[in-house]
Amino acid sequence: MNVRTIADLGPDERAAFFDRDAGVDAVRDDVRDIVSQVHEEGDVALRRFAEEFDDVSVGNIDITDAAERAYEEIDDDVREAIEDAAANIRAFHERQVPEDWRDDFEGRELGRRFRPLDSAGVYAPGGTAAYPSSALMGVIPAKVAGVEHVAVATPPAEEVNPVTLAAIHVAGADAVYQVGGAQAIAALAYGTETVSATDIVVGPGNRWVTAAKAEVRGDVAIDFLAGPSEVMVVADGDADPELVAADLIAQAEHDENASVVAVTDDADLAEQVVDAVDEQADGREREAVIRAALDNDTSGVLLARSMSEAVLFAEEYAAEHLSIQAADDESLLERIPSAGSVFLGPYSPVAAGDYATGTNHVLPTGGNARVTGGLSVDTFVRSTTVQRLSEDSLGDIADTITTLAEAEGLDAHAESVRKRFE
């Protein structure tokens, strides 16, 4: 990782930062085949893929009972941490629950009604690292929304990570299945002999998971298509380079394809961050993953000519995680509307939101924060508009309705209004 100047970036260098994608094209055909086999063969396909991809011979696909046992068996301090994080996540998401309303609009009674989806499927990743926190982030908003049946799929293993299972139990999931990857998404979307089909499938995962979500979208709802983790730190000259570096390293350890970027208008800070990143990466448990992420074309320390240029770059980037470590952080925040989740000040590490502040860490990547937000109660709620008109209030707008209907050539629409006054 080295310092590059924004103004000096060539077209290809600049495009690397903004043309981030989930990398699904390379696996799309294989994923389509996996999804098709699960759809057609059910549990047989799930067991076959567990052998092929996870090197595991799966007995019971449904391991719901194992989640409760894991909760009892894990270390007390880990159990307490899970419960504390869950309480914070639940409290934050309870503030999001929408309320039905009806109002009078010149005699027309109009309103909105909110109802939860009937079922939801949550993917809790495994692979190179287990993510019990993702189980909390996916299940809790669904249960807060009132979803009756929430199922979790997590990759199979000789022993599925007990901390992940305990987190699934604490979150309140109704069913747990040991199935991973694209085949898990297909199972949650279409159902098998063991796995119940759900109305929506949510949760982060690798490019196979993301490609599968793209494949089933249309037959089932999804949250969004997420790619590798990313963070952008916008910092002024007063920022602590050690803290900036720590936040970059923390996201880099997720995935060798992660994107980690710092932007500053202070040349000294930029060089200090580069040095601090190199020092802090040394000796970390996932150092190889970290250094691979740091070497990506989508990672770097960028020097801006001014904070205004830094802000413009950050807004165009639309980071999954945006950390603002600057004296006027609130002012800068107002100028960067596009970000999945924002962390203000030196004592708001991105890791806090990843685990325990209560906000959700399932967030849009690849610039999609320009048009959508992260996982929330809204993800699991459907809204319906409601209207009741009296004879008088319908009469007030009858001419408007009939005139517009006839202008569109839909005379039956117009007649359906006139009939009420015959």
UniProtKB/Swiss-Prot annotation:
Its EC number is 1.1.1.23. One of its GO terms (molecular function) is zinc ion binding. One of its GO terms (biological process) is L-histidine biosynthetic process. Keywords: Amino-acid biosynthesis, Histidine biosynthesis, Metal-binding, NAD, Oxidoreductase, Zinc. It catalyses: L-histidinol + 2 NAD(+) + H2O = L-histidine + 2 NADH + 3 H(+). Substrate binds at S229, Q251, H254, H321, D354, E408, H413. The active site is at E320, H321. Binds 1 zinc ion per subunit. Pfam families: Histidinol_dh. InterPro entries: Ald_DH/histidinol_DH, Histidinol_DH_CS, Histidinol_DH_monofunct, Hstdl_DH. Its cofactor is Zn(2+). Pathway: Amino-acid biosynthesis; L-histidine biosynthesis; L-histidine from 5-phospho-alpha-D-ribose 1-diphosphate: step 9/9. Zn(2+) binds at Q251, H254, D354, H413. Catalyzes the sequential NAD-dependent oxidations of L-histidinol to L-histidinaldehyde and then to L-histidine. Belongs to the histidinol dehydrogenase family. This is Histidinol dehydrogenase.
